[in-house]
Amino acid sequence: MNEKRYLKWYNKIGYGSGDIAGNVVYAFLTFFVMIYLSDTIGLNTGIIGTLMAVAKIFDGISDVIFGSLIDKTKTKMGKARPWMLWPYLGCGVCQFAIFAIPTSWGKTAQYAFFFIFYVMLNAGFYTANNIAYSALTALVTKNENERVQLGSLRFVFAFTTSTIIQAVTFGLVEYFGNDAAAWRIVALIYVVIGIVSNTISVLSLKELPADELDESADQNIQAATEKYTLRDAAQIGRASCRERV
């Protein structure tokens, strides 16, 4: 007997497009924020690296918190979709802010500005969005083959987006003037792309009714606290570089 299917092809593509949103934030941040901060703003890379490491403390705590909150959420949109939709707006604001550090401020204020928005992005908005996105596979289908397909499509979109971000970003920055304002414009372009693709992903799927879901859905929400991180983005980027070589 064939296992029941829950998703059409456009539902699967729509889900995969959610990793366009994830990578216009994190591929961009992972591969270019240090260059922007050191070469354009003039901050010390050692201090920036330390601030990023400290931020991971908050990140580890927030993983557990948001996993629990999503598990307890009950809305007309479902458990995960609201957490995927609205926090991404915060991702956009934080990403733009990180690439819009006021050049007239003193160094201490600039470090503080970066750290605050980096923590808000990495440990707050992105964590909520990405854990919800990861949990969604268990909430929109009970078909194991479809869940595998969703995961595969997610990787394809992530890999492709990361590769494109690496390939075009320097060219875009140079085109817009190769200065602080140019980085702001490029960040804004990526934010708009991210918001659009994330919204499409959310609206392309509908969570199954609670009485139709089994216990595996709750287990998958907890497992989703292992979210897609900066390290994962870097690994995808390195893999794409090897493919081009």
Where are these regions (language model features)?
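Membrane-embedded alpha-helical bundles of multi-pass transporters/translocases
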Residues: 2-244
